Every structure is written in structure tokens, then in C-alpha cells.
Amino acid sequence: MRKRVPDAGLSLVVAVVLLLITMPAGSLASPPAAQESQGLFVPVPAPQGEAPEIAAQPAVIRSRLVEVDLSLLAGSSPRRLALNLFDDVVLDVDLQEAEPLPDAGQAWRGRIEGEELSQVVLVRRGDLLAGDVFLPGAVYRVRSTGGGLHAVSQIDQSALPPEMEPVPVPVPPAPVDQPHDVTAQAPADDGSIIDVLVVYTPAARQAAGSTAAMLAEIDLAVADANVSYENSLVSQRLHLVRAVEVSYVESGSVSGSPGDLQYLQGSSDPYLNNVHSLRDSYGADAVVLIVHYPSPVYCGVAYQLAENVEAGFAPYAFAVVELTCATSNLTFGHELGHNMGANHDWFVNVSLDRHSYSHGYFNTQDRWRTMMSYNDV
């Protein structure tokens, strides 16, 4: 059942996520050495182990192809794992108990030993693994490339496009008071579970490599956001109600007059109108469209909840996310943060229309940021 999208609590959630470390890769320090243990990744010798199409991506510092020893992820109990990302980056990770996902999938979360400000999220879907590794000074990504192989990449977030400024919504007319029987109303839920419908384009699925890889990316995006809430001791969680491919070709702009966001939100144009019926069928609070542009200008955009539109915001709880940025740049959680009323960091947005805690934050000295901040540390 669709709920009214909360504002203050979620603004706080997104704004105080201090444990998602997303520093520029240029500040990479020597990572802690792993103990002697079997690594998750099995190197693939050249030339099969080379992935020039991945290495050519602007935000990729380096990459290599590997096989994944999935036997190390059998079961769901907590464990220690060696992430041998590269020859010079081998990390001991303490994983908590895996969370079950649909279709027998699993989501693992953990931290690197000796790095308090680190985060590891791994999602398994059959023989596919998708993962993000954040630690002070570096971001790493693991994605399937098909044929039983996976690419391990080091990501330079500063080379990714910026997030677009959120789109304000029209102020609705004041509601007219109507007599009603309060006792007859169903009790409202506490708002701690945010139901999200994710739709994606054929271009996004093709860029991901397959439908299974696309679904793993979506699972990872949700898991990344939920781990950030957990790290901040916030009880709220995202719940993926459905992930569906839609027949839609990117308009050329994630937002404009109109753009992808406006086509997603609108119900009177000829585009994406089935999304509204899907939203109603699955009771989604918010809807995210994942797109892919060969040379994206922005990582994403969303409508922003404002204090004067809280009661009438449901028709605007929509966001558009570029696949390239969805997880490694935390854009999925970032754009949903705008739906929840959060702003960019104070250096980008000085608006006081929400709460003092509903802005992104970055630490210039230690070079880390929260998900609502720009990559300007």
C-alpha cells in the first residue's frame, strides 16, 4: 500500500550518512594488507584477462578480468574474506550474515579490517556478482562481463558527471476540509519501509550486459542505500517491490522541457504511462528510472520534496539515474534523497527551506563525503 513519502526523517537519513566513504581516487593511500587466505578472485591470464572496453571508460583508473570463487560465498553465515582486487590491493573483509534476496540472491555487507571508514557490499545473483568497495582514498567496483568473467575496476569518482540540481514541484492548492470519520481510517504505517519501483531502459540493460546483470545492479543499489542507513543507526530501509524493463528510448536529457524525468512523471504524454499503473499495482512510494547515455552529462536528477508540498508530493516521487553512476557514485540513494527532501552540500546549495541537517556534508581534511555531497572534496 502506497504511503506518503516522509520528509524530515528521510532527510536526516540521507544527510547524516557518514560512513559511505567516496573520496577521490587521487588520494589513494596504501591499503591494509590481508592475512594469508584464499582470495575471492581468480586472475585470468592475458589476453583473455584484458578488458580494453572497460579500461577505456573515463572514470576507470585500472581494471582486470577475473573469475569469482563463489564457493567462498556459499551459505549465509558471517565470515572473513580476502578481496584480492589487484596485486597491490588485497583486503581482509569481515562480512556480516547475508541478507536473502529474490530469486535465491544474497546481499553481503561488511567492513575492511583496520579501516573503520570503509564499506563493502556484495550482491550475488546466481553465478553473477556485483559489488562496491569504499575505503579512504579509493573506490572499487566488481561487475559481471558475461561468460563467467567479472571485471574488477578502480573508480575515479571525480571523473563522473555531476548530479543535476533537483527539480522543484508546483505548490498544490490548499486542501478543502471534508467531514470524515477518523475511526474508520486504516492506521498509517510508521514510514520506516520505503517501497521503490525501479524501471530501466533497453540501453541500460545492454550496457549492464544482460538482464541478470541489470537486476544485480539494482539489487546492489538498494543494498548500498540500506547499508548507509544502517551505518548511520537509522531504522529506515528501502524495499524493492519490482524491477521492470520498459520500452523507452532516452530523450537526450535526464531533465528538461521535457526530459526523461518529465516523461517519467507525466501521465498525459505518450511515454512511460504504464509505469504509473505498475506503481499503483505494487504500491510503490517512489519510482526510479535507470537510463544510459554513451556520454552522460549528469549522473541523475529527481523532484525534491519541499515543506509546502508535503501532502501533495506523491505524484512527484520520481527520479532518473544514469547506470554508470548508480552505485559506485551512490547516485541511486542520492536522487531518492532529493525525493525525501535532502539538498546537496552547503557549498553547492545554501537553501534553508528544509532542516539544518538535510544537506550533504564533506570533510575537507580527511577527504570523505556523504552521499548527498558533490565530488568536490
Residue locations for each model-derived region?
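Fold-level signature of zinc-dependent metallopeptidase catalytic domains
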Residues: E36-P47, A51, A151-N308
